[in-house]
Swiss-Prot record, chain B:
It comes from Saccharomyces cerevisiae (strain ATCC 204508 / S288c) (Baker's yeast). The keyword Phosphoprotein applies. The modification Phosphoserine is found at residue 470. GO terms for biological process: endoplasmic reticulum to Golgi vesicle-mediated transport; protein targeting to membrane; small GTPase-mediated signal transduction; vesicle-mediated transport. Belongs to the Rab GDI family. Present with 23800 molecules/cell in log phase SD medium. This is Rab proteins geranylgeranyltransferase component A.
Length: 222, 603
């Protein structure tokens, strides 16, 4: 079946969530991925990253969204976390100014470790806490513009703008990737997430039952 | 006290867990279990296990303990993950070399570094490179691979195949004849040799059971055994021992060598026509980060830049350089490189591993199989100008592995030779590689017969008149551009082939009972430094032995099962069919579930 070959999607985007502890990254992830309307019932392919498949331009795009697993607490996120990410969301809590101030740190850590072409969104989460707001929307908007980031305020609690924030990012990545593929006259549309990176050798997938002589050179990286 | 029973894991302790499953054993981890914030509001003031150092063994151990249910605090004194297994950028290497030479990194000495100005201020940046301190390859059928799948850490990683194993002999690089088909079709092999090789391969897949064949040679060398018992000639003996077995010298004992040769053969064709895999973006450095992430998902707490100052075995309190303290209810596990000041129990690291890592500005794709970016070159004893007694291994990675940019290549050379000879051997191997490469790159001109002629012995001669310059001038112009050269000596307590011997940790156990007044490390257990072994084979064994010391038994070492789709839990456990494909491409073998492969000779 096509599933065995990992072709239940046309493109796979790895997206990482970063930001201080307690800003609601995990809730954003589960809010976005558990409200599924995708045909893929097996949306979770890891215990701490989850997927949702969207359709853009008739292409099935599988967004694989990674959470920090708590390693952000002491700023000990592994550099491997950023490998192959084509998108990132930097999340802060609108009711906690320190979490907004630390976005600078997260942005520079991202720039240091991720691919240069990574698409980045800034998310002010917990918009339902308007009465406790500590970070003015305008200020964040300016910061986002200065650093060429997408910007949305969301509430993982009442799900306001959650889909919008992820979809905007995924759309931006898609535009980047398709532009890149056009530039290259690229023909490989079969699921290599790293549309933006250098030509790679084929990757071996360890998950499928080995030894059926079927794929040794499958190009699906997950 | 140790509790031999299995404690509920972090995931099991969560209230949501039981709504997902009725049966707590084997552990089934529900979807998104790890993303529920598993951390307490403050730094834990009490943990079950403290681990210092985020190298391979420590990281596998941390993940195993976290999933078993232990509360783990995992720290590293560096600001990066990996410790002795780290994958570093060029800037990080520069700092590391300085620290080694200042004496602040124990277990390493004699670090010498050359970095071209092209890196940093020129066309390459420091982070274009990921240099492994102890590079490794992963055999397709190995204990680590099955743990990678079981723990799902493989999902954090990308792997590529490694099928080219070259043996350097008589000034040239022979590609390995390793499949039955290749043996059959190899025009250069005499019929008798083919027959003997096949006989040996048939034997080695199930060697343990055939004691009558190898037992008489148990205390003798592998080359005696292959020569006398299987009538194999030197080239085949060398290929088997050094390229397939990746052994270090001719004195290797028969059981060890058989084990290692079988490792290669049974790994072949498990995932495709290759025996080994390499991880992208770096080797052990990436894998250890994957296991650390897994441990974090399982509830472990991570801190970098955290240095252990002392552990008091009476109060069980560990103190860190930043003044913080934690009470450790069970064990403190420390990598030798992370030993606190005034430590007195660090095991002696008496064996040297000499390493030279080079980055060359040349794609050198000649070394690789099509579509691959990795190769292994082995220089057997006596093959080098230096008259080497020990093997020099060169592990080569190209840009496709994403550890270096397009147009460059990384050579990892290492030897188990001890003392000053080692550097001579490594230099000789480097020179041999350099010469071979220059020959290869000048052969690009071969099409123009007027410029390039082949001499009788295969060397290319360049028609200097045509080129408008003398031959002498031509050679320096073609000299290889080295972007980076790093030489260092690493020390380890693990001798070559000490991989599966768990008694190395008993040294540490004895130390637990000894109390030295004034020592900052009474009561701690030290892990081992990476050995010279080019495969990951020692890692799981070491982690398992340590796990057993902490938990009381290794029965539930990674005994977990993630709630999952229809995906089959591919275990790396011996599977008869894999033996079949290991050396056989045709259907002439009748397998009846036995590990014994009996290939029909069809000569």
């Amino acid at each position: 079946s096509s599933e065995d070959y990992g072709y239940d999607y046309d493109l796979l985007f790895k997206i990482v969530l970063i930001g201080d502890s307690g800003v609601g990254k995990s809730n954003l992830l589960s809010r976005f991925t558990k409200n599924e309307f995708n045909m893929d019932s097996k949306s979770t392919i890891g215990v701490e990253f989850a997927t949702r498949t969207l359709e853009i331009d008739g292409k099935r795009i599988k967004a694989q969204i990674w959470d920090t697993a708590g390693q952000e607490r002491y700023r000990a996120i592994t550099s491997a976390y950023y490998r192959g990410a084509v998108g990132a969301l930097i999340v802060y809590d609108i009711s906690k100014s320190s979490s907004y101030e630390n976005c600078n740190h997260w942005l520079s850590e991202l720039r240091e470790n991720a691919d240069d072409n990574v698409a980045v969104g800034l998310i002010g989460n917990k918009s339902d806490l308007a009465h406790l707001r500590a970070v003015p929307t305008e200020e964040s908007k300016t910061f986002a513009q200065e650093n060429q980031l997408l910007f949305t305020e969301t509430s993982a609690l009442n799900s306001e703008n959650v889909d919008k924030a992820f979809e905007e990012l995924i759309n931006t990545i898609y535009q980047k990737v398709s532009k890149h593929q056009m530039d290259l006259g690229d023909s490989s549309a079969n699921g290599n997430a790293n549309g933006a990176s250098a030509p790679n050798g084929p990757t071996i997938s360890l998950t499928p039952t080995p030894n059926e002589n079927k794929k040794a050179n499958g190009n699906n990286c997950c | 006290m140790l509790s031999p029973e299995r404690r509920p894991s972090m995931a099991e302790r969560r209230p949501s867990f039981f709504s997902f499953t009725q049966n707590p054993s084997p552990l089934v981890v529900p979807h998104l279990a790890g993303i529920e914030d598993p951390l307490p509001a403050t730094t834990p003031d009490k943990v079950d296990v403290l681990i210092a150092g985020t190298g391979m063994v420590e990281s596998v151990l941390a993940a195993a303990l976290a999933w078993q249910g232990s509360n783990v605090l995992h720290i590293d004194k560096n600001d990066y993950y990996g410790d002795t297994s780290a994958t570093l950028t060029v800037d990080q290497i520069k700092r590391w070399v300085n620290e080694v030479n200042e004496g602040s990194v124990s277990c390493y000495k004699n670090a010498k570094l050359y970095v071209s100005t092209l890196i940093g201020s020129g066309k390459y940046s420091s982070r274009d490179f990921g240099i492994d301190l102890s590079p490794k390859i992963l055999f397709a059928k190995s204990d680590l691979l099955s743990i990678l799948i079981k723990s799902r850490v493989h999902q954090y990683l990308e792997f590529q195949s490694l099928s080219n194993f070259h043996t350097y002999e008589n000034d040239c690089f022979e590609k390995l004849t390793n499949t039955k088909q290749e043996i059959f079709t190899d025009q250069n092999l005499p019929l008798m040799t083919k027959r003997n090789l096949m006989k040996f391969i048939k034997f080695v897949l199930n060697w343990e059971a055939q004691t009558e064949i190898w037992q008489p040679y148990a205390e003798r060398t592998m080359s005696d055994f292959l020569g006398e018992k299987f009538k194999l000639e030197k080239p085949q003996v060398f290929e088997l021992i050094f390229s397939i077995g990746l052994c270090y010298d001719l004195n290797v004992k028969v059981p060890e060598a058989l084990q290692r040769i079988r490792r290669y053969l049974t790994s072949f064709d498990v995932y495709g026509p290759f025996p080994a895999l390499c991880s992208k973006y770096g080797g052990p450095g990436e894998l250890s980060q994957g296991f650390c992430r897994s441990a974090a998902v399982g509830g472990a707490t991570y801190k970098l830049n955290e240095k252990l100052v002392s552990f008091n075995p009476t109060t069980k309190v560990a103190t860190f350089q930043d003044g913080s303290k934690v009470e450790v209810s069970e064990k403190v596990i420390i990598s030798p490189t992370q030993a606190p000041k005034d430590s007195k129990h660090v095991p002696q690291q008496q064996y040297q591993v000499h390493r030279l890592t080079c980055i060359v500005e040349n794609p050198c794709t000649e070394w690789f199989n099509e579509g691959e970016s990795a190769a292994m070159v082995v220089f057997p004893p006596g093959s080098l100008k230096s008259g080497n007694k020990e093997v020099v291994q060169a592990f080569i990675l190209g840009a496709g592995s994403e550890i270096c940019p397009e147009g460059t290549i990384v050579w990892y050379l290492s030897t188990t030779e001890q003392g000053p000879r080692a550097e001579m051997d490594i230099d000789a191997a480097l020179e041999a590689m350099e010469m071979a490469l220059l020959r290869e790159s000048s052969s690009g001109l071969e099409n123009d017969e007027e410029i390039v002629q082949l001499t009788g012995n295969g060397h290319t001669i360049v028609n200097s008149v045509k080129l408008g310059q003398s031959f002498k001038e031509y050679v320096p112009r073609e000299r290889l551009q080295f972007l980076f050269k790093l030489y260092y000596t690493q020390y380890t307590s693990t001798p070559p082939f000490g991989v599966v011997n768990s008694s190395f940790f008993d040294v540490n156990q004895d130390l637990e009972k000894k109390y030295i007044p004034g020592a900052s490390d009474n009561g701690v257990i030290y892990t081992t430094m990476p050995s010279a072994e080019i495969s990951y084979d020692e890692v799981v064994t070491a982690a398992k032995v340590l796990y057993e010391k902490i938990v009381g038994s290794d029965d539930d070492f990674f005994d977990l099962d993630f709630e999952d789709e229809d995906e089959i839990q591919a275990s790396g456990v011996a599977n008869a069919e894999q033996f079949e494909n290991a050396i056989d491409d045709d259907d002439d073998v009748n397998m009846e579930g036995s590990g014994e492969f009996v290939g029909e000779m069809e000569i």
